[in-house]
């Protein structure tokens, strides 16, 4: 198999044109190609009048492939990634806390090793969780144990289901292949910016859970970690809270994949004197535009092309005040969702289904902040800042989980909005006209305003006065890092405790969290064989 890079394909390409382009690149006859398959595909939209797909194609030839590679600088022998599944040794069943991407993939790898893991999740299974979330979005009745943050699949379940990642870890291919084998569409294997969509992601998550159970694992929903027992700096047990009361489970290995919103767990870990440090994160708001205008700005006359789909964007700028402003978790053809999980506090996120065909497109507009901006040097000071901003957003929205919104023109002029333009907010249960300048810190407001203006020069219409800001976006990443060793991935203080994933400060998104879960599982399996 040869991997051929830099193949340019038109938007209306078919299998025949792919074969022809590969033959031209390799300088061979088309009949020499037995088969070809796109390995990676991205959109090159730098020239709006000449948009094309830039692809990498895997081709199988019926002639000597090594000779062909030597004469073609854009090709090499393709090496298929094969994951080495280890077997579990003689040790008690490990426990995985949290059924987000990190926890699910950790439990899956452990189950395949024969470890019979126990996966506990404070929220509900994805079907009951979906019903709880939909009820909240329509009625404002928040369930603090089952919501956008807590439940099977983690916070990423109600998102765009993005599967791109900055990590170069070879395990990310493993994660994508697992998603496909559990029901995700094949295109996530080759799209440069793959996404599943919240509708398809739910079924995939259930299939992973079912395999864990079939392999001997145990999955416990509505089960919350409330304490841990140590002796001589070694993990000995955990205490869980269920509907039937508290229970102590003896174990010497726990993967702590709790997610970025498990604030009461952060406080419990701090009380147990586990080493935790405050880390930088970002705050801001969701910004919402008409999808057709974003598509036009990105794709010009090609807007609406079915193969292109709804347009994505990723913008960033560095300001004179030293702060960075950037867009994050862009949801083409999606909606802004109420992601609240605590009583009397409100935060937002973005979500798309697989089709990405809703009226608006949105993204987070964020300002980077660091521990120097926090109100104290407490390890949980960033978390307390999040809570403060979310409490202010709750009050600004009317104290009923309606979200505070503001037109961009009004935000730039520091005045409360009184009407909408052509962009209608998509968030539920409802919204309240507000002035986000009165919710967010002054340094965030100033930076967001400057960023909007500068980004309007990068993407036509980004600074449209009728675009809608919805507040607040405060949970793009964890505000803490639970310290761990670089070699064993165990807590720097407690042997057998593995801080893992986004909540622990070691990932940022579905793929990187899943990869971290796999790595922690591998460490436990390795230790079981010593």
Feature names for model-found ranges:
Residues 1-53, 57-158, 162-530:
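Residues forming the flavin
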């Amino acid at each position: 198999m040869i991997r051929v890079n830099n193949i340019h394909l038109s938007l209306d390409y078919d299998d025949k044109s792919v074969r022809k382009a590969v033959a031209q690149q390799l300088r061979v006859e088309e009949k020499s190609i037995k088969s070809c398959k796109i390995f990676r595909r991205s959109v090159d939209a730098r020239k709006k009048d000449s948009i094309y797909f830039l692809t990498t194609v895997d081709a199988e030839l019926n002639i000597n492939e090594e000779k062909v590679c030597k004469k073609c600088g854009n090709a090499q022998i393709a090496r298929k990634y094969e994951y080495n599944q280890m077997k579990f040794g003689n040790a008690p069943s490990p426990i995985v806390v949290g059924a987000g991407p990190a926890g699910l993939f950790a439990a899956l790898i452990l189950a395949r090793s024969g470890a019979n893991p126990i996966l506990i999740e404070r929220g509900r299974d994805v079907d009951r969780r979906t019903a709880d979330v939909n009820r909240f979005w329509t009625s404002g009745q928040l369930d603090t144990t089952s919501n956008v943050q807590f439940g099977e699949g983690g916070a990423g379940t109600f998102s765009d289901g993005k599967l791109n990642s900055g990590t170069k870890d070879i395990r990310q291919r493993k994660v994508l292949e697992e998603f496909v084998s559990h029901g995700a569409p094949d295109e996530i294997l080759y799209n440069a910016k793959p996404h599943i969509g919240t509708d398809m992601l739910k079924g995939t998550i259930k299939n992973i859970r079912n395999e864990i159970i079939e392999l001997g694992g145990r999955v416990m929903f509505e089960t919350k970690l409330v304490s841990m027992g140590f002796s001589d700096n070694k993990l000995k047990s955990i205490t869980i809270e269920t509907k039937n009361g508290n229970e102590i489970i003896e174990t010497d290995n726990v993967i702590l994949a709790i997610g970025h919103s498990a604030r009461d767990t952060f406080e419990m870990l701090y009380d147990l004197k586990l080493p935790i440090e405050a880390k930088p994160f970002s705050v801001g708001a969701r910004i919402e535009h008409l999808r057709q205008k974003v598509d036009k700005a990105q794709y010009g006359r090609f807007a609406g092309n079915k193969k292109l789909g709804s347009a994505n964007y990723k913008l960033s700028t560095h300001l004179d005040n030293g702060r960075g402003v950037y867009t994050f978790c862009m949801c083409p053809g999606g909606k802004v969702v109420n992601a609240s999980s605590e009583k009397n506090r409100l935060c937002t996120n973005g979500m798309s289904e697989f089709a990405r065909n809703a009226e608006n497109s949105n993204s987070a507009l964020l300002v980077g902040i660091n521990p120097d901006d926090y109100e104290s040097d407490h390890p949980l000071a960033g978390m307390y800042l999040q809570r403060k901003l979310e409490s202010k957003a709750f009050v600004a929205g009317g104290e009923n989980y309606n979200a505070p919104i503001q037109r961009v023109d009004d935000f730039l002029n520091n005045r409360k909005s009184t009407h909408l333009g052509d962009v209608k907010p998509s968030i539920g249960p409802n919204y309240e006209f507000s002035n986000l300048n009165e919710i967010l810190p002054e340094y965030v407001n100033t930076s967001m305003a400057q960023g909007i203006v500068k980004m309007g020069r990068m993407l036509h219409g980004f600074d449209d006065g009728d675009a809608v800001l919805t507040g607040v976006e405060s949970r793009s990443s964890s505000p803490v890092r639970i310290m761990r060793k670089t070699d064993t991935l165990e807590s720097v203080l407690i042997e057998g405790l593995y801080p893992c994933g986004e909540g622990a400060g070691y990932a940022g998104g579905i793929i990187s969290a899943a990869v971290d879960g796999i790595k922690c599982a591998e460490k436990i399996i390795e230790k079981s064989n010593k």
